[in-house]
A protein has these predicted regions:
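Detector for C-terminal structural segments
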Residues: 198, 204, 208-215, 219, ...
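N-terminal lobe/hinge region of extracytoplasmic solute-binding protein
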Residues: 2-61, 91
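Ligand-site clamp/hinge motif
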Residues: 70, 191-195, 217, 222-274, ...
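Second-shell loop/turn segments in exported
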Residues: 69-77, 113-115, 202-205, 239-240, ...
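Aromatic- and charge-enriched surface segment that lines or borders ligand/interaction sites
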Residues: 55-100, 126, 136, 252, ...
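Short, well-ordered beta-strand elements
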Residues: 11-12, 16-25, 64-67, 89, ...
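Extracellular/periplasmic solute-recognition and catalytic clefts
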Residues: 93, 97-101, 117-118, 205-216, ...
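Surface-exposed binding/hinge segments that line
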Residues: 105-184
Length: 585
C-alpha cells in the first residue's frame, strides 16, 4: 500500500542497484531492521502514527485495540502472514515460562493485568485491557519495536508443542544449545536480525550468516508496500554492509566508499567530507539531531549534602545558573553558530513545540543571574566566589563520562560565564558506570549528559521523561527509583513542582482523547522549562549524512533521531533509489 506516503513528495523511482553502508560491529546488522522500519504501525516523516504492515487499526476508549491485517500478505519466504502468527507469539511464546521467564513484555501489562486477546479472523485480532494502555501503539512503532507476532510456520519446528520430542532433541544437540527454549530463542530474534533462515517482513532480507566482514541484504520479494504507480518496493535490490573499525568510517565515507552513512560520523568530520564531495561523487547533508539538547547539565535534586540539596531544589538557583550560561557563545565557539541556543526541551519539529517555553531562562543575562543569587542570600566571599549559608564556597563539581572533547570545550565556557555570577566550576571525568552510580547514590552535585531522548514528541508518545519516573533521570534518580520499585527503594517525591509533573503523567496515561493528551503534554513541557529541572546548553546540533549523489528520495534536511525516527527509517529507505546520473531524477 502506498497510503503512508501520500503528500510526502516522494518521487517515483527506478528499480535496481546496490547501496553500501558501513558498521563497526557485527551485531549492528540489526540496524537494517531500524532503517528498514517496517512496523505494524509506524511514524511517517511528520511523526504521525499510521498503519503500515497493518491495513488499519482502531482504538476504543484507549484500551481496546483492533488490528486488521492485509489480505494475502506473506513473509519473505512465502509463508502466509495471518493472525496465527499473533496467536503463536501470545500463547506459545509470551505466555510460555521457558521462553519468557518473566512473563509477557511490560508493555502488555496495565496495572499488572494482561489483556484479553481475541482472534476474530485470519486478518483481524483484538487486544482489550480493563484500563487504557497508552504505551501499546507507540511501542509497536519504536526503532526497536515491541514484537507481538512471530513467523509461526517457521518457529513451530523448534517448539515441543508442535515438534516430535526426538527430532527436537536432535536439533538442540546439533545446534549445541542447552534446551529447546535456548534453540527457539536463537532462531527467533527479528530485531537482532542475525538468522538468514528467519522469515521477515522488512524490505531487505539478510543473506549472510555471522561472522562475516560483509553482510548482504536482498530485497524481500513479498514486501507489502508499493509506490503510487503500483510498483513493488523496495527500489534498491541489495544493501551491502561492511564491518570496519569505527574510527575508519569517516575516512572511508569521505573517499566515496559508501552510498548512505550517518552512523559513526560526527559534526567535526563535516569540513573533510565537504571538500571531497565533487571528487568522489557524494553529497553531505546536515540533519538536526532529535534530542532535547545536545548536552545538558543535571543538578542532582537528590544529593546527600543538605545545603546543596536545598539550593538545587530552589528554582531561583536553577534559573540563575541557566541565565549565567552563555549559549550563544557555546553555539558560536563549539557548533559554528549552527545549533539552537534553547533549553533542554522539544524541538521545532515537534507538533507540541512552543518557542517561548523552549527559550525560557535560556538567554544570557548575568545581571539577572546575580540578582537571583543575591535574593537567595548567597553573599560574595573572597575572590568573588559566593558563599553557602554554612560558609563553604559555592563550588560545583560537574562530573562527566569523559568521552568527548565537545564536553570539555563546553564546560570551559560554562566555567568562565558562571564565574561572573560567583559560582566556581570544576570538571571531573569519570567512567560512565562510575558516574551513574555516584548520581544514583546522591554523591554527585551535577552531571553533564545529553538531553531529553525525544525532542520530537507528539501527544501519543509518553511524557515520562518530564516527570520523576526512572532512576536513569540524573536530576532526580531517587524519586524515579521510588516509582520504579513501587516504594521499595529510593525516595518519595517531596518537591511540589515535581509532584505536579508526576500527577500529570498519570493523568496522561488514562487520558482517552488526543486533545486531552496534547493539553497534558503542553502543560508538562511548560512546567519543565519554567522550573529549569535541567539546564540544556544547545539543541539541534548537526549530524552529517553522506549519500551517493545519485541517491534519490533522501531529504536534504531532516532529523537524525533514534526514537521516534529510527535514524533513516521514518524517511522510508524502501523508497530510496539510484538515478543514472547526479542530475536526473
Amino acid at each position: 500500500s502506498s497510503d503512508l506516503f501520500e503528500g510526502e513528495g516522494i518521487s517515483i523511482g527506478m528499480s535496481g542497484g546496490t547501496i553500501r553502508i558501513l558498521m563497526a560491529k557485527a551485531k549492528e546488522v540489526r540496524q537494517m531492521v531500524v532503517y528498514g522500519y517496517a512496523r505494524l504501525i509506524g511514524y511517517d516523516s511528520k511523526l504521525i502514527l499510521r498503519a503500515d504492515i497493518l491495513k488499519k487499526f482502531n482504538v476504543e476508549k484507549g484500551r481496546i485495540f483492533t488490528l486488521t491485517l492485509r489480505e494475502g500478505h506473506r513473509w519473505s519466504n512465502g509463508d502466509r502472514f495471518t493472525t496465527e502468527d499473533f496467536r503463536y507469539w501470545w500463547e506459545d511464546m509470551a505466555n510460555n515460562k521457558e521462553l519468557f521467564p518473566a512473563g509477557p513484555p511490560v508493555q502488555m501489562l496495565v496495572d499488572g493485568a494482561l489483556p484479553t486477546v481475541e482472534i476474530i479472523s485470519e486478518t483481524e485480532i483484538r487486544f482489550a485491557w480493563e484500563h487504557p494502555n497508552p504505551e501499546f501503539i507507540p511501542a509497536l512503532a519504536k526503532a526497536s519495536p515491541l514484537y507481538i507476532y512471530a513467523p509461526s510456520a517457521y518457529l513451530k519446528k523448534f517448539h515441543p508443542k508442535y515438534q516430535e520430542a526426538d527430532k527436537l532433541a536432535q536439533m538442540v544437540a546439533a545446534e549445541n544449545r542447552q534446551n529447546w527454549a535456548s534453540l527457539h530463542n536463537r532462531k527467533d530474534n527479528s530485531y537482532k536480525n542475525d538468522n538468514p533462515d528467519l522469515p521477515t517482513l522488512q524490505p531487505w532480507v539478510i543473506q549472510t550468516a555471522p561472522p562475516a566482514e560483509r553482510y548482504i541484504f536482498s530485497r524481500n520479494p513479498f514486501y507489502h508496500r508499493v509506490d503510487t504507480n503500483g510498483f513493488q518496493l523496495p527500489y534498491i535490490d541489495e544493501v551491502h554492509m561492511d564491518i570496519v573499525a569505527g574510527k575508519l568510517i569517516p575516512a572511508k565515507a569521505g573517499s566515496g566508499e559508501v552510498d548512505l552513512q550517518g552512523r559513526y560520523l560526527n559534526f567535526n568530520d563535516t569540513p573533510f567530507l565537504k571538500q571531497n564531495e565533487e571528487k568522489y561523487g557524494f553529497v553531505t547533508h546536515l540533519w538536526r539531531t532529535g534530542k532535547g539538547s545536545q548536552l545538558t547539565l543535571y543538578p542532582n535534586l537528590n544529593i546527600e549534602d543538605r545545603e546543596w540539596r536545598d539550593l538545587f531544589r530552589d528554582v531561583k538557583f536553577r534559573r540563575a545558573l541557566s541565565l549565567a550560561t552563555n549559549r550563544e557563545e557555546i553555539n558560536e565557539v563549539v557548533y559554528f553558530g549552527l545549533g539552537l541556543p534553547q533549553n533542554n526541551s522539544l524541538l521545532p519539529g515537534s507538533p507540541i513545540y512552543d518557542q517561548k517555553s523552549a527559550y525560557a531562562y535560556a538567554e544570557f543575562d548575568i545581571e539577572n543571574a546575580n540578582a537571583l543569587l543575591d535574593e537567595i542570600g548567597l553573599k560574595l566571599g573572597p575572590g568573588g566566589i559566593r558563599l553557602l549559608p554554612d560558609g563553604r564556597k559555592a563550588e560545583i563539581i560537574i562530573e562527566t563520562a569523559g568521552e568527548s572533547t565537545e564536553e570539555t570545550d563546553v564546560l570551559q565556557l560554562i566555567h568562565d560565564s558562571w564565574l561572573r555570577a560567583g559560582i566556581k566550576v570544576y570538571t571531573k571525568p569519570l567512567q560512565r558506570e562510575v558516574l551513574r552510580n555516584r548520581v544514583f547514590s546522591g554523591q554527585t552535585q551535577m552531571a553533564i549528559w545529553s538531553g531529553l531522548q525525544n525532542g520530537l514528541a507528539s501527544p501519543e508518545m509518553s511524557p515520562a521523561e518530564l516527570a520523576p519516573t526512572s532512576q536513569q533521570q540524573l536530576q532526580w534518580p531517587m524519586w524515579g527509583q521510588y516509582l520504579e520499585t513501587k516504594g521499595a527503594a529510593g525516595q518519595a517525591v517531596d518537591l511540589s513542582a515535581a509532584e505536579l509533573q508526576l500527577e500529570r503523567y498519570f493523568a496522561w496515561r488514562v487520558a482517552a482523547s488526543f486533545e486531552a493528551k496534547k493539553k497534558i503534554w503542553s502543560d508538562m513541557v511548560r512546567t519543565y522549562n519554567d522550573q529549569v529541572f535541567t539546564i540544556g546548553l544547545i539543541s539541534g546540533a548537526l549530524q552529517p549524512i553522506v549519500a551517493n549523489a545519485r541517491l534519490r528520495n533522501l531529504p536534504a534536511e531532516g532529523y537524525y533521531n533514534w526514537d521516534p525516527g529510527a535514524h533513516f527509517g521514518s524517511y522510508r529507505p524502501d523508497t530510496f533509489w539510484l538515478s543514472l546520473s547526479k542530475t536526473d531524477g
